[in-house]
């Protein structure tokens, strides 16, 4: 690619959209710090001991203002950091500029092409001749995937001399990944194997990335230990639920200015993300219908006063469609053709394959009208009616708005810091094998406790007699590992 890495006056590499936005980014970072008590407590507690001294951390996670506070927490604890975004639309350019100028190497801008996206991922992993990172903070698992695919290709090349063939897959992103790996083999045929040897572990932020990790663990191909941050209670029950409850309507209204009240809204999936989305739409006055495969989740939706139907039942009736499943092929182009004129179609799951964007883009005679960035009207030739697709089927809350608010992200990112400290602290102990782990309950409770004071909460204290009666320590943890909250 023709992209060139730039360098700050202090010698730090970067590639962002506009460094003149750095002062603006710094002002918003300072505001966010006040709303992120968990991360600021980590700086206070761990800063003096510098637990990351000598550690290289590569991050692939939405380059937002909130992520900037996470990055500067990692650097405040002694780490060197290189960062890219995990979505082509999610970067906040002023945040990227501030971090690139002040704290860490950043390769991210809003509106990357897929080629640029993977170039940025490669740059975030490029620590020069000394090898790759020690630790990875991942969101969706793309950097983890790149390393695993790279190692696999290098091993095949070493045995057979065969280079990866990008034409062997129909997936456009995988074609780019294989091209990057193929070109890299010509200059350093052991790059990813050397990287694998150095990596201590990864902490994964989201449901989709965790699913990939468990698949690799099951197949015996996971190359290094992983901590599943997503399934910490203080992540999934807060970020996924309350974060989406906040950011879904924000994205809808910024993109379309539509009035939610009175509309028929379909939420595909009723997991934690779906629950947050359905709650937001219901509170906004929409009539909410849920589609589900799981009878337990379906029953939960019914108990909240929601209808549970199939997509086919409501496809021509609904005004708003939101996919939240983490699966693929949820809304196909054949479904979109049946929707009412100007129905809004959007996704808040991690990848863009929940909505059949390829089928829509290649539909004969379809016309795309860009209303504004990340808001497109697609008109079908047969009916002359159209649908409005947000963020090209990618994360609409980050593509059309600014994602989750700082406070709830403080919960998620405090888990990330604790997971990274745990992996680095135990790097030579053998405690973590090439498996997927979750953080223990007492750390989950600690993350929650760090956020109570800011909201004016006061915890009731157990007496020793009461604690003995329910068989828990006075200081916690208070729930068994299987408790579902």
UniProtKB/Swiss-Prot annotation:
The keyword Metal-binding does not apply. Substrate binds at residues 64, 139, 205, 235, 239. Its EC number is 3.13.2.1. SMART domains: AdoHcyase, AdoHcyase_NAD. It holds the Pfam family AdoHcyase_NAD. It comes from the Eukaryota. It catalyses: S-adenosyl-L-homocysteine + H2O = L-homocysteine + adenosine. Keywords: Hydrolase, NAD, One-carbon metabolism. One of its GO terms (cellular component) is cytosol. NAD(+) binds at residues 206-208, 240, 269-274, 292, 327, 348-350, 397. Pathway: Amino-acid biosynthesis; L-homocysteine biosynthesis; L-homocysteine from S-adenosyl-L-homocysteine: step 1/1. Adenosylhomocysteine is a competitive inhibitor of S-adenosyl-L-methionine-dependent methyl transferase reactions; therefore adenosylhomocysteinase may play a key role in the control of methylations via regulation of the intracellular concentration of adenosylhomocysteine. NCBIfam families: ahcY (TIGR00936), PRK05476.2-3 (NF004005). Belongs to the adenosylhomocysteinase family. This is Adenosylhomocysteinase. The gene is SAHH.
């Amino acid at each position: 690619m023709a992209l060139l890495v730039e360098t700050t006056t202090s010698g730090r590499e970067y590639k962002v959209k506009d460094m003149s936005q750095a002062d603006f980014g710094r002002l918003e970072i300072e505001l966010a710090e006040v709303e992120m008590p968990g991360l600021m407590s980590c700086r206070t507690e761990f800063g003096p001991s510098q637990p990351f001294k000598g550690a290289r951390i590569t991050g692939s996670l939405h380059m937002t203002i909130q992520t900037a506070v996470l990055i500067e927490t990692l650097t405040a604890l002694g780490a060197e950091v290189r960062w890219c975004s995990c979505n082509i639309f999610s970067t906040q350019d002023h945040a990227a500029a501030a971090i690139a100028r002040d704290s860490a190497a950043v390769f991210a801008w809003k509106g990357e092409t897929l080629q640029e996206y993977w170039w940025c991922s490669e740059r975030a992993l490029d620590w020069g001749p000394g090898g790759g990172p020690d630790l990875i903070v991942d969101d969706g698992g793309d950097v983890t995937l790149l390393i695993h695919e790279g190692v696999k290709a290098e091993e095949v090349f070493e045995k057979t001399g065969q280079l990866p063939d990008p034409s062997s897959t129909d997936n456009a992103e995988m074609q780019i990944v294989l091209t990057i790996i193929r070109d890299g083999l010509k200059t350093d045929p052991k790059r990813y194997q050397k990287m694998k040897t150095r990596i201590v572990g990864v902490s994964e932020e989201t449901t989709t990335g965790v699913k990939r990790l468990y698949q690799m663990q099951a197949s015996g191909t996971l190359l290094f230990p992983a901590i599943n941050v997503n399934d910490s209670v203080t992540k999934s029950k807060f970020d996924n639920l309350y974060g989406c409850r906040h950011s879904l309507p924000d994205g809808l209204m910024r993109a379309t200015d539509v009035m939610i009240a009175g509309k028929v809204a379909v939420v595909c999936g009723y997991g934690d993300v779906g629950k947050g989305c359905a709650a937001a739409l219901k509170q906004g006055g929409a009539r909410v219908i849920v589609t589900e495969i799981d009878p337990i989740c379906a029953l939960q939706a019914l108990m909240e006063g929601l209808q549970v139907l199939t997509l086919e039942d409501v496809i021509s009736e609904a005004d708003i469609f939101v996919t939240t499943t983490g699966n693929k092929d949820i809304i196909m182009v054949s479904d979109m053709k049946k929707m009412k004129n100007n129905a809004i179609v959007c996704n808040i799951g991690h990848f863009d394959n929940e909505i059949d964007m390829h089928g829509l883009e290649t539909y004969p005679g379809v016309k795309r009208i860009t209303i504004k960035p990340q808001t497109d009207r697609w008109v079908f030739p047969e009916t002359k009616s159209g649908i409005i697709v947000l963020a090209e089927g990618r994360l609409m809350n980050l593509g059309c708005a600014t994602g989750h608010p700082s406070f709830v992200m403080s919960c998620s990112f405090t888990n990330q810091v604790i997971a990274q400290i745990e992996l680095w602290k135990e790097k030579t102990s053998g405690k973590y094998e090439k498996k997927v782990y979750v953080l223990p309950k007492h750390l989950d409770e600690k993350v929650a406790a760090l956020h109570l004071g800011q909201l004016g909460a006061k915890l009731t204290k157990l007496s020793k007699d009461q604690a003995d009666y329910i068989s828990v320590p006075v200081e916690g943890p208070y729930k068994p590992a299987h408790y579902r909250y």
